[in-house]
Amino acid sequence: MKKVGIIGVESKHAEFFGKLINVDKAYPGFFVEAIAPIDKADRLPYVLERCPIKKICDSAEELIDSCDCVLLITRLPQTHYALAMKCLDAGKPVFVDKPFTASVGEAKELLEVSLKKGLTLLGGSSLCFDPSIKLNLAQIKSSPLTHFKFTADPESPFGGYAFYLSHLTDLCTSIYGETHLVSASRKGNSISSLVRHASGIALLSTSLEPHECEIIYEQQGKSSLLTLSDTNCYQNGLNAFFAAVNGAPSSNEYLSQSVALIGEITNFFLNQ
């Protein structure tokens, strides 16, 4: 039985992940052993009501020492680099919630260390692990124009536009690899970013209107729609992480590419 540790409780992902593992028993080989409420301790009772966790740690270091792998779910990406590096330095696989890091340099360094140590490092938006993407990957990758759409608040209190934009940049780079901004526009709270990748163009559109994430792509001259579940995404993310911890192959290069694309888009509007 592998012991899982959760760092952070401010995000609802704490109880979502904890419930899947400890209550629903979706992963027989894993159990949440400890949680470290280092970001918003007053939310801990709410989390524990929904997923019982025996060990409460006062620090990330204490949690890392007591667990075999870590779910790092503090909200702000500015906290992710140092905490994820502590996990890797201790030889522990780690899942880093989105947005992955605050800078490209931080992302690349984490990826390099994980590769050097042979440790699993996954994370970002769990929408990327939706099985329907893999089933339709060839068609999506061959589409000359792909449209990614999701809800995002440009003025999010959790770091602004980048917080929710990361869902779409993670999806785009996980499918197409390195991408670069061509142009962007904003009308009220709706933002569209046109980006170029090696085989075509992608459009990333966000608005305040609540809706499930959509990927619209061309297939044999017709538009096809792929809707990604935002209820199953948490389980999909854990499926990928725990499979990788158990030895399944995984890729994570897209995470630094996504951080770079976030920077291009947010800087575009800052410089206007």
Predicted regions and their residues:
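N-terminal Rossmann-like dinucleotide-binding module
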Residues: 1-51, 141, 242, 253, ...
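Short beta->alpha connector loops
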Residues: 11, 75-78, 100-101, 127-129, ...
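A general structural signal for well-ordered alpha-helical segments in protein cores
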Residues: 14, 44, 80, 107, ...
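Rossmann-like dinucleotide-binding domain that binds NAD(P)(H)
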Residues: 36, 148-210, 260
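Beta-loop-alpha module in the N-terminal Rossmann-like domain of NAD(P)-dependent dehydrogenases
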Residues: 46, 51-111
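A contiguous active-site-proximal alpha/beta segment in oxidoreductase catalytic domains
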Residues: 101-158
